[in-house]
Amino acid sequence: MQKRELGKSGGNSGGSSGPPAKRGRPFGSTSANSAAAAAAAAAADAMSPSALLGPSLLVHNSFVEQNNRRIVLALQSGLKSEVTWALNTLTLLSFKEKEDIRRDVMPLAKIAGLLDALLLIIDDWRDIALPKDLTRGTRVRTLGTNASVTGFGNEYDALASIQPPGSGIGSSAAEALGKKSTGKHQSSQWWMEEDGLFNLDDEGRSEKQMCAIAASNVIRNFSFMPDNEVVMAQHRHCLETVFQCIHDHMTEDEELVTNSLETIVNLAHLMDLRIFSSLKQSYININEKKAVQAVVGILNSSVKAWNCAAAELLGRLIINPDNEPFISPLIPQIHKRLIDLLSIQAVDAQAAAVGALYNLVEVNMDCRLKLASERWAVDRLLKVIKTPHPVPEVCRKAAMILENLVSEPQNRGLLLAYENAFAELLFQEGKYSDSFARILYELTARSNSRVASARGIWGM
């Protein structure tokens, strides 16, 4: 206690002391205590928060510039220690909060060869990956279980059960010779039956899988940085890899699929599907039709988070007019699934479905015509508004979808059946009264809608 009090009094009497040193690598074990303290204070002053890559990482901004070539070579080396170091480093460098104060000197995706090196790690795993239903479980080694000496710890039990020669009655030399030759033949076949005895296929496979997942996580982090979006959206190998992972979502690792899906969602607003038929070098056989089918396939999956991401992805892809010809053939299938998502009692699924439908009907007339004829489409959109959805923007988009549907003359006869529901919402929901006023005007005030109104009212 006396020493502690003396230390406190000595620190207070010395006036204003420097900030405490950050934890990290020691500055030198051979230097004196005073020199170490001075070095720690100097390092703490030099490392201001604006110069750090993260709130608690002692990594300077210049680290990327000085080590970018080393990181790429480490990824390409294939050595476990080097690849692990590079992936861990990139994970730290690529993790960036929205309000982070740091500014990378160079966008990570623009480092020469870095994106290709990461994609190569994923391709190496996919080359040896087995479908989940074909993956072998833990196998019990049965090498030489019927032999007297096996090398697996059963020697004493086996030797104790051996009968001495001549104990059998009526045994002949020919039978003994036959048994001896049979034993030799069986022992020579042990090594052929025990595949993978002297290599570590399963362990190596799991290491490759972990590296591929880590690489996909780094690429996902890259896609969140605006400086990297253009480079990645125009990188054919990157798009082919992530779309192929999405296409194989039934058999591929779930985390790898999730990272690929989030990556492609972040890049979708800049993506042109015609890149798959361009003259750029191709690494995976995938075209525009297969890419859209992969997204629709994951939209129909049983994982709700994947459904939401796929819906958002389709809504962003359709904004580009060049992508419409590849999405239009699958519009009926997409509509049906999005309407199913509206019926799920989950606010995120409903929001994703409404957002995708809003973009589809905004840019494509064929979408407006087909959506109005879909069963339960209007009912579930009205339910989102009546409930209401906790996010007002979702309710507003649902009302805008109905307004877009009624703008097509072919849809007015179908929508007249909901005239009473529209009138109720006109007086109940003040926020969306303008939209429903325009909807009722389109249904009843147009000169060509008199016959349609009679059909809606009298059921003609």
Curated annotation (Swiss-Prot):
Q: Where are the ARM repeats?
A: 227-269, 323-362, 366-407
Phenotype reported upon loss of the gene: Developmental and morphological defects at the vegetative stage in cotyledons and true leaves, and during the reproductive phase in flowers and siliques. Increased abortive frequency of embryos.
List the expressing tissues.
Expressed in roots, leaves, stems and flowers.
Question: Which keywords label this protein?
Answer: Developmental protein, Growth regulation, Nucleus, Repeat
Enumerate the Pfam families for this protein: BAF250_C
Q: What is its main location?
A: nucleus
Q: What is known about its subunit structure?
A: Interacts with AS2.
Q: What does this protein do?
A: Involved in leaf and flower development. Plays roles in leaf development partly by associating with AS2 and repressing KNAT1/BP transcription. Required for the formation of anther cell layers and normal expression of genes that regulates anther development.
Name of this protein: Armadillo repeat-containing protein LFR
